[in-house]
Regions:
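DNA major-groove recognition helices of helix-turn-helix
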Residues: 123-137
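Short acidic alpha-helix initiation/capping motifs at coil-to-helix transition points
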Residues: 73-76, 101-103, 123
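Amphipathic alpha-helical interface surfaces
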Residues: 78-82, 93, 126
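Conserved aromatic-histidine-acidic binding/catalytic patches
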Residues: 20, 70, 115-122
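N-terminal interaction/assembly modules
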Residues: 1-88, 108
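Helix-turn-helix DNA-binding module
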Residues: 103-120
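Long, hydrophobic, amphipathic alpha-helical segments used as structural scaffolds
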Residues: 40-43, 90-93, 134, 138
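Short amphipathic alpha helix immediately N-terminal
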Residues: 88-105
């Protein structure tokens, strides 16, 4: 994925965040798909770890179930954060905002393929609001 440089929004905009902070948050959101896969694999790993722990152990003490449960909590927390912030940005446009920020989709794609029910200006207002809310919650 190439980084598309867009014109910076004015510092007077109510949802202004620094350009570098925006890119940090954008790349944070693009990991959503990986987190979903890792979260799902933790379920299988916990079941596997529970079976392994019943076997005679080696000299290395560890709690595999706790390890996978902590990973699951880590990924689950991030998944819920992005979903909650997308819902806060606009509960009606939530599914479109979520897909856009986690898959890097443009408004043009959302309009032509997914028939987003709003105009470009409204969408980008909610898109900026999403990143502003995410920035506030991650401080």
């Amino acid at each position: 994925m190439a980084t598309v440089i867009r014109a910076q929004i004015s510092e007077k905009n109510k949802y202004y965040i620094d350009k570098h902070r925006y890119y940090e948050l954008k790349h944070f959101c693009l990991q959503y798909g990986e987190w979903k896969k890792a979260y799902a694999s933790c379920n299988e790993s916990i079941i596997f770890a529970a079976g392994i722990e019943r076997l005679p152990s080696s000299n290395i003490p560890s709690d595999l179930t706790a390890k996978y449960a902590m990973k699951k909590a880590f990924y689950g927390e991030r998944i819920k954060l992005i979903e909650r912030i997308a819902m806060e940005a606009d509960d009606f446009l939530y599914p479109y905002i979520l897909r856009a920020v986690t898959e890097g989709l443009s408004y043009t794609y959302l309009k032509s393929r997914l028939d987003i029910p709003c105009g470009r200006d409204m969408y980008y207002d909610r898109y900026r609001k999403f990143f502003w809310l995410l920035s506030e919650s991650r401080n």
